[in-house]
A protein has these predicted regions:
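Donor nucleotide-sugar binding/catalytic pocket of nucleotide-sugar-dependent glycosyltransferases
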Residues: 1-23
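Conserved donor-binding/catalytic core segment of Leloir-type glycosyltransferases
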Residues: 29-46, 52-55, 67
Length: 164
């Protein structure tokens, strides 16, 4: 490489075009519910069953909502699980697939982005959320864990739903 005058520094590919990011400033109110956003393909490894187990531990009267965006083979199972459980049905909205441009509105409403994947390197949605200044909750086992400090997100070990 040195013969070609090329730096030996590794090349980093950024999956999120920060020039394309729109202003998603959002007004926060201390009186409103906390909005969590999760986006991705609805498959087992995304950890949604694990997330739903953790959500069922939150008291019913807590003011929050979880907006789940994406499609896949697990979507109907997740919708049924929400419908069958009162603690989830009032708080979790499984929206299915939405147009990419609609995600801007979802990010604008979100207070926290959740990436509960049990096997994921670094998802593009994680980078998108971070680029919009949204704090992230994710597992402390894969690529996403290297992107955070205590000011930008929360990591959990992924050993139990109680920890989550």
């Amino acid at each position: 490489m040195k013969n070609y005058n090329v730096s030996d520094e590794p090349v980093t590919k950024v999956a999120v075009d920060i020039d394309d990011i729109k202003d998603t400033s959002r007004e926060k109110s201390l009186n409103k519910e906390c909005v969590f956003l999760m986006a991705g393909r609805m498959i087992y490894r995304k950890g949604l069953d694990f997330l739903f187990d953790a959500l069922m531990r939150i008291p019913q009267e807590t003011r929050y909502q979880v907006r789940v965006v994406g499609d896949g083979p697990e979507l109907e199972h997740l919708r049924k699980r929400c419908k069958d459980n009162l603690n989830l049905s009032e708080h979790v909205h499984c929206m299915g697939s939405i147009p990419y441009m609609e995600m801007e509105k979802e990010y604008a409403c979100a207070d926290v982005f959740i990436m509960p994947s049990i096997r994921e390197t670094t998802g593009t949605v994680l980078l998108e959320a971070m680029s919009k200044g949204i704090p992230v909750i994710t597992i402390n086992k894969f690529g996403g864990a290297t992107l955070f400090d205590e000011n930008t997100g929360w990591l959990y070990e992924g050993n139990s739903k109680e920890e989550y």
